[in-house]
């Protein structure tokens, strides 16, 4: 199994306001990425899963990653 790089974009609602986000993760499958997004955004911003809306999950090349940690981990191997 090969670890892939995914870019996730969407928004979450808190206190009647909408906040956009774009995140990059390394994972084996899209389902794993969804779980990471819900866990990460929920814990950082104290938002319930039903208030997190994922618009797009896209697989990208490791070279396209903007997050330095994700890029370095992906290109090391």
From Swiss-Prot:
Disulfide-bonded cysteine pairs: these are none
What keywords does the record list, in alphabetical order? Ribonucleoprotein, Ribosomal protein, RNA-binding, rRNA-binding
Q: Report any one BP term from Gene Ontology.
A: translation
Any Pfam family from its record, for instance, is: Ribosomal_L18A
Query: Would you say which domain of life the source belongs to?
Result: Archaea
Q: Which GO terms describe its molecular function?
A: large ribosomal subunit rRNA binding; structural constituent of ribosome
GO cellular component: a single term: ribonucleoprotein complex
Q: How does it assemble?
A: Part of the 50S ribosomal subunit. Binds 23S rRNA.
Family per similarity comment: Belongs to the eukaryotic ribosomal protein eL20 family.
Name of the protein in its database record: Large ribosomal subunit protein eL20
Query: Which species does this protein come from?
Result: Pyrococcus horikoshii (strain ATCC 700860 / DSM 12428 / JCM 9974 / NBRC 100139 / OT-3)
